[in-house]
Design a protein with these regions (language model features):
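N-terminal [4Fe-4S]-dependent radical SAM core
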Residues: 96-167
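Glycine-rich beta-alpha loop elements in corrinoid/cobalamin-binding modules
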Residues: 1-115, 119-125
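Functional transmembrane helices that embed catalytic/metal-coordinating motifs
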Residues: 28, 168-169
């Protein structure tokens, strides 16, 4: 998941700290958390003609900008990738700050520097209100695997979860 790799992260396969997937993929924006309202807001801005590179104030998003830009939200912590990849203590401290800023009420923006670029994670999007959540679950979901799996006999693992209910989000 891109959201798990939105900051500098340890890669067990390579046995090293890698850059944010947003830097390596050269994507325009990354979303994290429950995406219903995030995507709705991004779509509304795109519909108004706002270029994707200018969408930098939506909560629950991560974007790259110039190193000297000013984030739209109060910043709780900022680190340089080149230091994070070589200093285990700093990496652990950064992770702690990231962890403490996952709450949509108290969470603040976070920053990582990559050469002349700045990666900004906006604070998390607030959870859906009851009416919004009801609307999501009222959508006409098929509640079955995609038909492309039918030719291979379906998805055996679906039997474990087909009668499950959402406990929390």
């Amino acid at each position: 998941e891109a959201s798990l790799r939105r900051f500098a992260h340890y890669d067990y396969w390579d046995d090293k700290v890698r850059r944010s997937i947003l830097v390596d993929s050269r994507a325009d924006i990354l979303t994290y958390g429950m995406g219903e309202n995030i995507l709705r807001r991004i779509a509304a801005l795109l519909d108004k003609g706002v270029p994707i590179k200018k969408i930098q104030d939506v909560r629950g998003t991560v974007y790259l900008t110039s190193r000297d830009a000013k984030p739209h939200y109060e910043v709780a912590g900022a680190w340089d990738y080149d230091e994070l990849k070589t200093d285990k203590r700093l990496y652990a401290e950064a992770f702690g700050v990231q962890y403490r800023n996952t709450d949509s009420i108290t969470g603040k923006a976070l920053v990582e520097y990559y050469d002349n670029k700045m990666l900004v994670q906006n604070p998390p999007m607030p959870p859906l209100e009851r009416e919004e959540l009801d609307a999501v679950y009222a959508l006409p979901y098929m509640r079955r695997p995609h038909p492309c799996y039918d030719k291979d006999g379906g998805v055996p693992a679906i039997a474990e979860v087909e009668m499950s209910i959402t406990h929390n989000r």
